[in-house]
Each structure stands twice: as C-alpha cells, then as structure tokens.
Amino acid sequence: MSFEELRVIIVVYSSALIPLIYLLYSYKKLPPWVPLIYITAFIACALGWEVWFTYGLVDGDAVDLRRSAVLSSWIPLHLNWFLNSLADAGTVTLGGFWLMWRMCSKDNQIFSSWSWKAFGVFYIWCICQNIFVELFLYHDQLADGKLLSWAPLAPLGSYLNPELFSFNGGSVMLQTQIPWIILPAVIYAAVIKYSNSQLIKST
C-alpha cells in the first residue's frame, strides 16, 4: 500500500463516519432540520450520482476498473457509494452549513429566510471541496479517459465532458462538477422550507 492509497482510505472513512458519529451523539442539541437534511442529502447524492458513478450503470466504468486493487479491497465496490454519500451529506452538506453559519455571524435567521451571502458561502464551499476531491483525492479514478456513468445529477454524462482546467497533473472535468453546481440551491431551499414549517408548528 502506498502513502497516497493510505491517505485516500483515511480521508474517505473519516469524512464519512466522523460527521455521522457526531450527529448521532449530538442530535438532541441540534436544530430539528439537521437530521432530516442529512438523510435527504444522503439520498439525493446516492441516487443523484454516487450509485451511478460507482457501478458505471450507463456508459461508464465501475469504480473498481478506475482505481487500484488496494483501494478496491479497502473500499469495496458495494460500500463505495455508501461512504461517498455519507461524506456528501455530512462533511460537505452539514459541514457547509456550519461554515455558512459561522461566516454569517452565527445568525440563525439564514436558515429560515434566503440569504445570498449565506448561500454564496455554502455554494463556494461545495464547489471548492469538489474541485479538491477531483484534484487531490480521486484524481486517478476521475482522470481524463476514465469513463463515468451518466447520472440524473450529471445529465451530460461523458458525452459532453470537457476539461475545465488542470493543476499539478490533475484535471477538473465538467461531468464531476455538475452535481455540486445543481444541488446546493436545492438543499438550502429545503432547509429554509423545513425550518419554517417547524416554526409554524411551534406557534
């Protein structure tokens, strides 16, 4: 096992499990929308692209064909989409909302009415983390020439997938960025809707 493979394994498992453990431990202290949004984001990411990319369901290669045997043994095929979706829901989504809250002076009002500043923070976080993942974590299995499946939240598939830019030998492709271009606004709107529905119930 190389150091890079070890790094990928540690990051994948920690980004998937640490937020889940924290959520299970602290859910009574958190706003009621947090667990619901976590589950909603998990389902959206799993069905939106993670399952499709993992198994190569439509004109794509399964993840085992796009990475080393070591990674496939430590992150099995049938666990890959699950771990990635946990990380999407926890580290990316809930982590992004925590960062958004901190950057907006801990103003809880951003979760009950739309704030462009708050959304901007959340959107930039989602895009930047995805670029980081593509360049430094999954750069080998997402590299140019590795075919990813069409997916509902990556509707252009590999059919229209230009390279957006490259850095340090890694490439950022359009197909892998589209899900996090689409999803942040939907998730933020869902938080506001659910938060307001809870306020109505409590009055």
Indicate residue ranges for each PLM-predicted region:
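Aromatic-rich, lipid-facing transmembrane alpha helices and their immediate juxtamembrane interface loops
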Residues: 1-203
